[in-house]
UniProtKB/Swiss-Prot annotation:
Name by which UniProt lists this protein: UDP-N-acetylglucosamine--N-acetylmuramyl-(pentapeptide) pyrophosphoryl-undecaprenol N-acetylglucosamine transferase
Function of the molecule: Cell wall formation. Catalyzes the transfer of a GlcNAc subunit on undecaprenyl-pyrophosphoryl-MurNAc-pentapeptide (lipid intermediate I) to form undecaprenyl-pyrophosphoryl-MurNAc-(pentapeptide)GlcNAc (lipid intermediate II).
Residues annotated for UDP-N-acetyl-alpha-D-glucosamine binding in this entry: T10, G11, G12, N124, R166, S196, Q297
Organism annotation: Caldanaerobacter subterraneus subsp. tengcongensis (strain DSM 15242 / JCM 11007 / NBRC 100824 / MB4)
Keyword terms: Cell cycle, Cell division, Cell membrane, Cell shape, Cell wall biogenesis/degradation, Glycosyltransferase, Membrane, Peptidoglycan synthesis, Transferase
Catalytic activity from the UniProt record: di-trans,octa-cis-undecaprenyl diphospho-N-acetyl-alpha-D-muramoyl-L-alanyl-D-glutamyl-meso-2,6-diaminopimeloyl-D-alanyl-D-alanine + UDP-N-acetyl-alpha-D-glucosamine = di-trans,octa-cis-undecaprenyl diphospho-[N-acetyl-alpha-D-glucosaminyl-(1->4)]-N-acetyl-alpha-D-muramoyl-L-alanyl-D-glutamyl-meso-2,6-diaminopimeloyl-D-alanyl-D-alanine + UDP + H(+)
UniProt subcellular location: Cell membrane
Membrane-protein topology: Peripheral membrane protein
Name of the coding gene: murG
BP GO terms, sorted: carbohydrate metabolic process; cell division; cell wall organization; lipid glycosylation; peptidoglycan biosynthetic process; regulation of cell shape
Length: 364
């Protein structure tokens, strides 16, 4: 069978598609899989790296305010729709699966018009605009949270599946992760990561935190590729001493080692990040991004904070002193860390990819 995936922009839309595609290949070795994305999204790099073919179309998101860019967006939407139609005609997929991002719009609507079976997956507790608009037309809407079902009242069918995660994340032990990353087992490891695009406020706060003397834990800062040079410049400008207990890297393509090695994660609250840290069971301090549509990251974070697995600090309240005190408090309470770890794991759904594969088989 031929499977077409549409999704992109950030890792949060790409990695679920990759996880589902790998699940398909596990069950159907002869399956043909094609991804559709854009030239500017992270899919341009990540999809080929995962071993899948990617074709691109022209599309961009609508701005909140009317402007010349709005006209450009409308023009690109028509262009993208024509390009999507050609891809469907050439590839002849048996099913089209959308995992979010602007690219889903033209591809999924073209598939609906051609009466090709369709499924979309929503990662966030509060759904994105593209998926909300597509939901009345597609065959199945798969959601990650029970809380999301109420937003898809006009959908034909809504199923709670959880978020698909990559199987390799669950296979690494702490010792293996520490060795791979070059950290000692003798001290705790705190990891900060701002998502696939990075997070300037988290990065700058972590650099400030490195100035605090008598720090008893190791630090890994994953800056995001676009922020790496800026972070190194700040380190140099402010004469921050980096010893063997600190590493700063732009990005990691092997998050399985990072999650396994970490005692505490400091991260955004994107849906895929949350799915991964719950599956692995990493106690985390969540800093929801205030720059996302409908403030969905805080919505995600508060939903899980209420379960006792994570602590939340809003970006407007974030500073090095507050973050350091929170880290020190958690590290001084091993029983609390263990409790957070267990509560996180209890909320995870590690079979989401298989559930979605089973749903796909019901419409093909």
């Amino acid at each position: 069978m031929r499977y077409l995936f549409a999704g992109g922009g950030t890792g949060g839309h790409i990695y679920p598609a990759v996880a589902i595609a790998k699940e398909i290949l596990k069950n159907e070795q002869d399956a043909q899989i094609l991804f559709v994305g854009t030239e500017k999204g992270l899919e341009k790099e990540l999809v080929p790296r995962e071993g899948f073919e990617l074709v691109t179309i022209e599309v961009q998101g609508f701005k909140r305010k009317l402007s010349f860019d709005t006209l450009k967006t409308v023009y690109k939407a028509f262009t993208g729709f024509k390009q999507a139609n050609k891809i469907l005609k050439d590839f002849k997929p048996h099913v089209v699966i959308g995992t979010g991002g602007y690219v889903c719009g033209p591809v999924l609507m073209a598939a609906v018009i051609k009466r090709i079976p369709t499924l979309i997956h929503e990662q966030n507790a509060f759904p994105g605009l593209t998926n909300r608009l597509l939901s009345p037309f597609v065959d199945i809407v798969a959601v990650s949270f029970e809380d999301s079902v109420k937003y898809f009242k006009k959908a034909k069918k809504v199923v709670v599946t959880g978020n698909p995660i990559r199987e390799e994340l669950l296979r690494v032990k702490k010792e293996e992760g520490r060795e791979k990353l070059g950290f000692s087992m003798s001290k705790p490891l705190v990891v900060s990561v701002g998502g696939s695009r990075g997070a300037e406020k988290i990065n700058s706060t972590m650099v400030e935190l490195l100035k605090i003397k008598d720090r008893k834990f190791q630090v890994l800062i994953i800056t995001g590729s676009s922020n790496y040079d800026k972070v190194l410049e700040k380190v140099k400008k402010e004469n921050v001493v980096l010893d063997d207990s600190v590493k700063i890297v732009p990005y990691s393509h092997e998050m399985q080692y990072v999650y396994a090695a970490a005692d505490i994660m400091i991260c955004r609250a994107g849906a895929i990040t949350l799915s991964e840290i719950t599956a692995v069971g990493v106690p985390s301090i969540l800093i929801p991004s205030p720059y996302v549509a409908n403030n969905h990251q805080e919505y995600n974070a508060r939903l899980l904070e209420r379960q006792g697995a994570f602590h939340v600090i809003l970006e407007k309240d974030l500073d090095a002193k507050k973050l350091y005190e929170k880290i020190e408090y958690l590290l001084s309470e091993p029983s609390l860390l263990n409790e957070m770890r267990e509560k996180a794991k209890s909320m995870s759904r590690t079979d989401a990819s298989y559930k979605i594969y089973q749903l796909v088989k019901t419409i093909t």
